[in-house]
From Swiss-Prot:
It is found in: Cell inner membrane. PANTHER family: 2,3-DIKETO-L-GULONATE TRAP TRANSPORTER SMALL PERMEASE PROTEIN YIAM (PTHR35011:SF2). This is 2,3-diketo-L-gulonate TRAP transporter small permease protein YiaM. It holds the Pfam family DctQ. The complex comprises the extracytoplasmic solute receptor protein YiaO, and the two transmembrane proteins YiaM and YiaN. Its main location: membrane. The keyword Transmembrane helix applies. It comes from the Bacteria. Residues 30-43, 99-112 are periplasmic. Residues 1-6, 67-78, 136-157 are cytoplasmic. Keywords: Cell inner membrane, Cell membrane, Membrane, Transmembrane, Transmembrane helix, Transport.
Length: 157
């Protein structure tokens, strides 16, 4: 799954870079531009960000503040990990719910140039929150079933 997401990110970034570069050349070199590039780049950037968040989560690359947790005993580290993963799971659920509502609400509104549904931008949040929630459920399961687990399992493992 990670390789597929990385390939999607690479294609997205390549398309985004090319269309913006071409539009810059056209705008400053020939005093014209492709109007749809601005809208398309917004959509691509939003999806790039949310798919990138999934890959970063799988790589355990998100910012973590661990200096306090590392000073705790293994039993307390496990308790804090349970609370942390539970909170992340709750936030993913809230994010998925809100993204679904906003996507449905704005699906009938269309962008002025491309005519794409505005809800398509909000829809990018849904797969991100669901995939991260899946990993969090797995982490919670591993923490609960491992009686001698000292620390939280790796994020993307």
């Amino acid at each position: 799954m990670k390789k597929i997401l990385e390939a999607i990110l690479a294609i997205n970034l390549a398309v985004l870079s090319c269309i913006v570069f071409i539009n810059i050349i056209l705008r400053y070199g020939f005093q014209t531009s492709i109007l749809s590039v601005d809208e398309l780049s917004r959509y691509l950037f939003v999806w790039l960000t949310f798919i990138g968040a999934i890959v970063a989560f799988m790589d355990n690359a998100h910012v973590q503040v661990t200096f306090l947790v590392e000073k705790l005993s293994p039993a307390w580290q496990r308790r804090v990990a349970l609370v942390t993963h539970s909170l992340i799971l709750f936030i993913c659920g809230a994010l998925a719910w809100g993204a679904t509502l906003k996507t449905i609400q704005d699906w009938s509104d269309y962008s002025p140039i491309l005519g794409l549904p505005i809800g398509l931008m909000y829809a990018a949040c849904l797969p991100t929150s669901l995939v991260i929630a899946f990993f969090e459920l797995r982490h919670l399961y591993q923490l609960i079933t491992r009686s001698n687990s000292l620390t939280s399992p790796p994020q993307g493992a």
